[in-house]
Regions:
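Ankyrin-repeat-protein effector appendages
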Residues: 97-190
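Ankyrin-repeat positional consensus site
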Residues: 13, 33-35, 45, 66, ...
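Conserved ankyrin/ankyrin-like repeat signature
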Residues: 5-6, 37-38, 70-71, 111
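Ankyrin repeat A-helix N-terminal signature
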Residues: 1-3, 30-36, 62-68, 95-106
Length: 190
């Protein structure tokens, strides 16, 4: 990263703290993607907390999408709009749920809690997305690194509770030697 002293010096020399790059991303936006402590410094120096990029994404959107709870909290505490919509019509909460997968479930639950506590609005689509996160997680459960499994499980339970979603049944795989017992009835109900 760029040393704080250099950031301060550049601003003192007249560099526009909100100057966008080709994609409309400001220095604050870029640092929010990385979850860097420089976010706090840029805000203290006057960076525009709500300035979106070319696609309408704010620094809060990308801090959430890249799973940086500490940065999300800082941006919320400094007044970022939790209901700002990007060009796809997604809020930071909708965005983090859209990109959530496997080992990031715990961070997603933490970020979702912060955003909801700050006034972010839930939608029916979010409830459906949480259910899909659960289905995807259960399908891939056996392939998830055991070091992350407990945190992901806890995060998933938190998401289920936050969005009032019935937990997806845990996937049971055959061990290759136990007898297979088939329930009576048509195959769709088994």
């Amino acid at each position: 990263g760029v040393p704080d002293e250099l950031v301060i010096w550049l601003i003192e020399q007249g560099l526009d703290i909100n100057i966008p790059d080709y994609y409309g991303a400001t220095p604050l936006y870029r640092q929010a993607i990385l979850g860097r402590d420089t976010v706090k410094l840029l805000l203290e120096l006057g960076a525009d907390i709500g300035k979106p990029n070319t696609y309408g994404e704010t620094p809060l959107h990308v801090a959430a999408e890249f799973f940086h709870p500490k940065t999300v909290k800082l941006l919320i505490d400094k007044g970022a709009d939790v209901n700002a919509k990007n060009d796809m019509g997604r809020t930071p909460l909708a965005s983090v749920l859209m990109v959530c997968r496997g080992i990031y479930i715990a961070q997603t639950a933490e970020i979702a809690t912060m955003l909801l506590d700050a006034g972010s609005k839930k939608t029916p689509a979010m409830k459906e997305k949480v259910e899909n996160i659960g289905k995807d997680f259960e399908f891939h459960r056996e392939g998830i690194n055991p070091d992350y499994l407990e945190a992901a499980d806890q995060g998933l339970e938190k998401l289920y509770a936050l969005f009032d979603v019935k937990p997806v049944a845990k996937r049971i795989t055959h061990d290759g030697s136990a007898p297979i017992l088939v329930k009576e009835g048509i195959w769709e109900e088994q």
